[in-house]
Amino acid sequence: AFYHYFDGKDALLSSLSVLFDERYEELMQQPHDEMDCIELLCWLNQELFTTIENTVSIELLARLFSSQLVTKGEKHLLDRKRTYYRLLRQIVSQGQEREELTDTRTVSEIVKAYAMFERGLMYDWCLSGGEYSLVQYAREMMPLFLDGFRKK
């Protein structure tokens, strides 16, 4: 019934990426100048995961991952032109310029690792049927993960 608003399931699923990107655009309008890049990435992650936990069904998120695994066409989650990737590149690049992040890894390597870790958190949450809070778990794990990229 929900699908009749979209041109099939693929359009519905790809709209999730658009929803996430729109959320990032809204968040970046809020003041965040006081944060270093790791705090900013953790905050964005918390806000996105709160949106996901409160408004996106696990079944729909699982279908998005499933469809991206089997699709031969466009993989929305990996589209480097998305707001998500542009924003991550900007934050990581500034983090390196401000000497908050290591320069032993390229911007692209750090962005790829971050996106992969974030997807992994969502994927595991789907696999476990949401038996734990995605937001709470990411609040503990994301800073530990990102600390590995902090300039020593």
Where are the predicted features?
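Hydrophobic alpha-helical connector segments
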Residues: 15, 19, 29-56, 107-114
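Short amphipathic alpha-helical segment with a characteristic S/N-K-E followed by hydrophobic residues
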Residues: 8-13
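C-terminal alpha-helix
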Residues: 91, 144-148
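Amphipathic alpha-helical segments used for helix-helix packing
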Residues: 52-72
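Short hydrophobic/aromatic patch on the recognition helix
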Residues: 1-6
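Phosphate/oxyanion-binding loops and surfaces in catalytic or ligand/nucleic-acid-binding neighborhoods
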Residues: 19, 23, 47, 51-55, ...
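Hydrophobic/aromatic-rich alpha-helical bundle segments in the mid-to-C-terminal region
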Residues: 96-143
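Amphipathic alpha-helical packing segments from all-alpha helical-bundle domains
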Residues: 25, 72-98, 108-112, 116, ...
